[in-house]
Amino acid sequence: MKKRVVKLRELVPAVAALAVAVLIQSATGSSGGSGHTPTTQATHADDHDLTTHNGTEEHDDGHDDGHDDLHAHAPKVIVFISGSCLFGAISRSLFKKLPIPYTVVLLILGAILGVVASNVPLVEEHTRDVAHMDPHVLLQIFLPVLIFESAFAMDVHTFMRSFSQVCILALFGLVVASVLTAVLAMNLFNYNWNFSEAMMFGAIMSATDPVAVVALLKDLGASKQLGTIIEGESLLNDGCAIVIFNVFMKMVFFPQLTSTVGQNVLYFLQVAVAGPLWGYAVAKVTVFFLSHIFNDALVEITITLAATYLTYYIGDIWLEVSGVLAVVVLGLIVNAEKTSISPEVEVFLHRFWEMLAYLANTLIFMMVGVVVTQKALVAVDKMDWFYLIILYLAITIIRGMVISLFSPILSRIGYGLTWRNAVIMTWGGLRGAVGLALALVVENLAGNDVIGSKFLFHTAGIVVLTLVINATTIQTLLRILGMSDISIPKRLAMAGAVRRIHEGQNRTLNMLKSDRFLADADWDIATAACEISDPYSALSDDENAPADELTLGERKSVCPGCKAMVPNEPSPREFADMMEEARLRMLKAEKISYWKQFEHGMLAREALRLLVQHAEVAADEKDQFILVDDLKKSWQIKGIYPWLKRKLEDLISEKKIAAIPMPKYKLGKLMYKICHHMAFEVTINIAIVLNIVPIIMEFVVQDKMASVSTMAAPGSTVSSEPSSLQKIEDALRISNYVFFVIYAIEAIVKILGLGRHYIVSHWNKFDAFILVVALVDIIIAETLLKGSITINLSSIKVVKLFRLLRGLRMLRLTKALIPKLILVVNGKINNQLSLGYDVGKGYIIGEEEVGKIIDRMVDNKKILRELKHISETGRLQVVKELGLLQREHPGIAVSVKTRQAIRTILNHSRETIHELQGAGLLDEMEAHKLELTVEIKMKRLMNAPSSIPPPPPENLLKNVSWLAGDMKLIDFIKARASLLHFDYGEVIVREGDESDGLFLIVSGLVKLYGKSAFLDHDNPPVTAGSEENEVFEDYLTVGNVIGEMGVLTKKPRNATVTCETTVQVYFITAEDMNIAIDTFTLYPSLEYRLWRVVAIRIATPLIMEQMAFQGWTQEKVKLHLERGYLVDLAESHFQFNIDATLEDVILINGTAYNAHTREEIRSPCLISRTVHKLTFQYTATEEPRLFVVRNAEYNGPILDGRLDVDSKRSLISITEISSNMCLKHAAELRQKNSKVMLSRKSSGAAAKEEEDCIPNTSDVEQAAGVSPSVPTKTTPKPKSFLPSLGLSMSKERVNGEAVEESPVKTKQGEETPETEEGAAPRVNV
């Protein structure tokens, strides 16, 4: 995957550059070949109009240069594109530290290139096609890229919150600014422009492009809301400016197409409203396709690129709506639903569009620089320069007037508007590429220098002046207004981060100094080269700020009485600022956690969107956090689905057969059996289906007969057709009688069989109604046939009505479909519940992740306690709600948990593939095939069912970690477990009580609380930095085990467990657990498994507190600990050496001592790396337990008590002979031992056969050249987990039977008892 990532990163700029090059080459070729391409709305009417004025001459030139010599000029265009990109890269690199935007440098370079091209024919050949390129094509190539990239990178939540402000500025503000600019141009300039021409100029001048200002605001950490308003206004007013420009351009250059004022207003509304609708439709289609593609970067990037250009072209050319506004909506919708993009692809997608936007800006400003020097400066006089300066001042004043005009409204909606923000918005209204492109359009269409060249000159001048003056001074203005000041909490956070970086550097330096290869390095130079300074340290010298306010550490004062240093409490304002900063950082950390869960496949797309939305809404409100009440709405089912489900269930709700008593008389009993028989129901349904045909034919025949009788002339001979129709009508009437008899028989059978219960069913009521209708229909038909009633229009309508009502019997067929409809509705409800459960689970994990780092967010203890309380309270509330949800809908919880388990396994599988490929054990092709297999399964997981039936309670025992895989042990526990019931509020266990057994929750929800940080269950709510006497709470649900630690240590309960609902549990007494521990001693023994489960549970929070594991998820930490094992301390005489092969050493139980310093270490504790040897004191009440994790690179044998006797003897034998035997013979001996062990395990041989088959220790020692050991007597030692050479053992029970022991020589010459093969003594706890 890493190699694939590198390839994609290399591919992004190459594809982007190639795309731009192809577009520009095709554009220059087409513009040169066909003059001007009519692509805007204003040019749709008449292509001939575009060839007026100087258009014909350019057409001729373009024809000569385009068609006849296209292939000769194409490489020159590519040279220009490549050279422009090179100049852009050099300018961006060289002028990065200067306050001048690099686009200004490119514009100047383009102008210089244009001047050189005017005097040097060789250079002019490479710029000719660019200088004469159609400006419409320029817009269509670059504008979609610039618009989509800006919208796609915007904060959607902030934009939507400020949308009303943006619309006012982009619509009404643009119109006012355009009118004022037009009035200024008409009265200031001596160009004799009319109002239409001046409005066209005003629209161009009002199109803003504040890219440089927005980037600067982000770099300075200024208000995100302000930057979003400025950028959002630019996006929308570009589209509105183009629409206004097209309206007045049509009035200027195409007067024959001039419309009335009302038509122009309608046209503006049509374009401005229909454009976003078109963009919304395309965005939904794009999101749909993206959501069905999994981890394919090329396809997803291509879809967004194609959607962008198709949206702009189709909307702008075919639909005649605003393509700009359509692309804006497209970018915003795709951005808002970016969860439809694969997490692995999202980064590359952003980089791709950033690269395209960079190339587009680079080429636009280079091209405009060339065009301006060759076209705009031709007819410029001194007065034009004066006009330019006045115009620059005027448009700045006009923008300030517009913002001031609408400020009463802007300050009361959205995020509001302060006077400081208004000043920045006024000064930050830069002009850019859109205005230049529109000016080129005017220059291309105008036939006189008064319009075309002046438009281009003034537009280019305003662009340069705003970029050079406004963009370079905006930072100074921010500093003057105090908007660039870094708050005290931010400085404190930065200082804390730098301090932690220094601590990490010091640890790394100390570690490297002990490296034998780096021992002679110059550490002074290394330390100086790695020095990281605080970026905000220079700001602390601000003369306006008090010295104590800028102190990054804790401020203290001297007590006048005792002269002691007393910490100062922050002022209310400081406390509020620190609390607000901590709140925002906490919400940001929660959002990061949500995104991480989504990237790992642990959170659904819609769940991520909801959680991020809740976090962003909370961030907008002061002192607000994510509310549990808002989260509860995700899994609360409301609306039409519950109502529809109830109605459908009411339609099919009938009394059960057992609930309807059988009649006592014989005929009634027979009818009862008939009406409840499946064949009876099927027969009636078949009759209903067959009855549909005559009902339809009756309508057809009746209409046919009516038409024939109407067409027949009086006294004329009628053909034989009516007689045939009459026969058909008679047959249909007879069939109606037959079906009526069938339905009547059905009603009689049900009435006789059900009695008074017949009328209870809604369907029986419906059948009775239809039966009455059919009877009335027959009576009316017979009456008409006999002529008792005069046939007229009214009678015919009555007959048709009754026949139509008779056809309603077909609705009864839907009775069979109602269960299917209920399943569909249940599926929708389950999807909503699954989404809600996913939201709650994601929130819980987010709070747990934040809890690990919250101590490093805040230095103030009061704020820290408050944030912890808020986080833990919200987590517990959601845990409780999800427990109640699981009780009501267990299948939902099972489905979500199953999906998470599957994705975790697949993630680990993919990481393993990457590790194997990185180590060279897999080729790229092999790794790709394996990874493709994993990703196919990941994609299938996206369509997993939202509900899975929960397993039976017996299966919960199989899922207990220390029971999994051992069927004999499971049967043993199942036989001795008792199922207990507890009501709401009952106490299952109480803190301080003696441990009497284990509890496995089968159903319901319990609350657990206690003062110990390591509560006795599977999910200890450990919070980093918790106080010693703090009370911990948590909720447990199905599958959790309570009481393992108490059974092992025989200590009193350390927590109280109460029922939050009615609860069912499996209870295994402590006596039965002791019997099981004594009985099941084969590898791996039950006691070892129990201790290992407890060890991993205790070690997980200890490991996650360490700095090196801060970026790890809980699953990854547990996976890391799975490589660990419990050390058999009895074998090593309660001493343990810590060498370089050990990565983590955790004291789980008891007390240890540092052998060198005699420092006491109490459990639970992660042993420091500075400790190299531990000693332990064995006591009968508290036996020490040590859990170690070896390095991943360690490949040696692990004698940890997990191996059975055969494995240990084999490993010890191999270890002893490894230095005295060649590889061949050592391998032969190891193979022989392996075969013997396999045969012993399969046959279950006795101990005597074991001595005959397994090589004797003395034989091994003789083969290795070691003298046999002499047996000696020694005092018994504490018992170990499993028997092995050199261990002290006593009389044991194997599978419930006592085994006599015989002395065995130990390696140290000590005598120890021997047990039967595979037996393990229990550990005294």
Curated annotation (Swiss-Prot):
Ranges where the record places region cNMP-binding domain: 968-1068
Entry binding sites for 3',5'-cyclic GMP: 1043-1045, 1053-1054
Consequence of changing residue 399 to A: Does not affect the production of voltage-gated currents. Abolishes sodium:proton antiporter activity
Compositionally biased tracts (Low complexity): 1266-1280
Consequence recorded when altering residue 1053 to Q: Abolishes cAMP-induced shift of half-maximal activation voltage of gating current
Basic and acidic residues biased stretches: 44-68
Keywords from the named record: Antiport, Cell membrane, Cell projection, Cilium, Fertilization, Flagellum, Ion transport, Membrane, Signal, Sodium, Sodium transport, Transmembrane, Transmembrane helix, Transport
Pfam family, one: Na_H_Exchanger
Record's bilayer topology term: Multi-pass membrane protein
Site (Contributes one equivalent gating charge): 803
Annotated region (Disordered), positions in chain: 28-68, 1237-1325
Region of interest (Interacts with the transport core domain), residue spans: 605-620
Chief location: membrane
Stretches the record annotates as Interacts with the S4 segment of voltage sensor domain: 575-620, 860-919
Region (S4 segment of voltage sensor domain): 796-857
Extracellular membrane side: 30-76, 120-135, 189-194, 250-260, 320-322, 378-382, 447-450, 709-724, 785-795
Positions that bind 3',5'-cyclic AMP: 1043, 1045-1046, 1053-1054
Further remarks about this protein from its record: The VSD and CNBD domains are not functional in mammalian SLC9 orthologs. In addition, the conserved Asn-Asp/Asp-Asp motif that coordinates sodium ions in NHEs is lacking in mammalian SLC9C1 and SLC9C2, suggesting alternative transport mechanisms and/or substrates.
PANTHER family attached to this UniProt entry: SODIUM/HYDROGEN EXCHANGER, SODIUM_HYDROGEN EXCHANGER 7
Record's protein name: Sperm-specific sodium:proton exchanger
